[in-house]
Amino acid sequence: MHAKFLDTLDWGILIAYFLILIAIGIWASSKRKKGSSLFLAEHSLRWHHIGFSMWGTNVGPSMLIASASAGFTTGIVSGNYAWYAFVFICLLAFVFAPRYLGSRVSTLPEFMGKRFGQSTRNILAWYTIVTILISWLALTLFAGGVLIRQVFDIPMWQSALILLIISAFFTMLGGLKAVAYTNVYQMILLILVSAALAIVGIYKVGGISALTDAVPADFWNLFRPNDDTAFPWLPIILGYPVMGVWFWCTDQSMVQPVLAAKSLKEGQLGTNFTGWLKILDVPLYILPGIICLALFPQLENPDEAYMTMVTHLFPVGMVGLVLAVLTAALVSTIGSALNALSTVFTMDIYVLSLIHI
């Protein structure tokens, strides 16, 4: 396996990262792993576990690529999807979470089944499994494979397989608790490295004023005219709520950390913490794309904006750290999806099939 951008120091940082990650996973696995303790972490998650876990599930590699690409092509307007999400995250905290936790369910199909019958539960269980397989696992593994392939000279399927094995290791080892605890460590690392990338980029451009002069003026507009082909303001205001309620309030992969909260208060605090973390999406993920346009206007593929910034601005050692961060985002998203998938399959399909035998 040949690494295109990695030096000895980069490899050392990568190895150290995985050793720490494995230690956290083993520690979390020392807890009981039966029934709800495996899938819902024994209802022991505190607000910071919930907040970082939800944000980590959302901040996958596809989002990193897409956010930097959007910043490169259109500026901060795509940040509406991050900042507007606060409304629906609050909706989860104050409307949905009390009902979910009050009913003491393990999955959202189970919650709907209690209200509307077993047929509804069965339909939603299979729908949830298909959704996780396609929109979470397949797309995340593909995006992760693209990123890993840029660094290692290995086929796409091998990249995806490696990521799947690493994520499955933590999910099977300690269940949701292992995923949640490693998410705290991984997301703090992601914030620090992404902030360093933005700061170094601004310095290379020559400061904030130089950056604003180097890109089109409308790159700093949060709303664009309704005849804009990329981001008209009306669909953002009226269309996003439909997707926002589904994604933040009813998607099993996103909501599962809330179901595992130690109490309703912890669940609500953690959910609100996620909303505050979403504010960071613009400076950490979209801004590097804008900086990339200022530094590398000749770049043909906007999807390469993030890795272009990394490989051109960071010294030896930092590239390995960034790769560790990208792996962190991958492991976080895939691990959460695998845990949600196994929870729904076990609780809503397998267990019920045994009852009816």
Where are these regions (language model features)?
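Membrane-interface "cap" regions at the ends of multi-pass membrane proteins
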Residues: 1-64, 171-174, 187, 193
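Loop-to-helix junctions at membrane interfaces in multi-pass transport proteins
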Residues: 2-6, 40-49, 66-80, 113, ...
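Alpha-helical transmembrane segments
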Residues: 9-18, 82-89, 231-240
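Membrane-embedded alpha-helical core segments of multi-pass
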Residues: 20, 63, 88-95, 104-105, ...
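Transmembrane alpha-helical segments in integral membrane proteins
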Residues: 22-25, 238-254, 327-336
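Hydrophobic alpha-helical segments and their helix-loop junctions in multi-pass secondary transporters
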Residues: 24-31, 134-137, 141, 145-162, ...
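Helix-loop-helix junctions that connect adjacent transmembrane helices in secondary transporters/permeases
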Residues: 67-173, 257-355
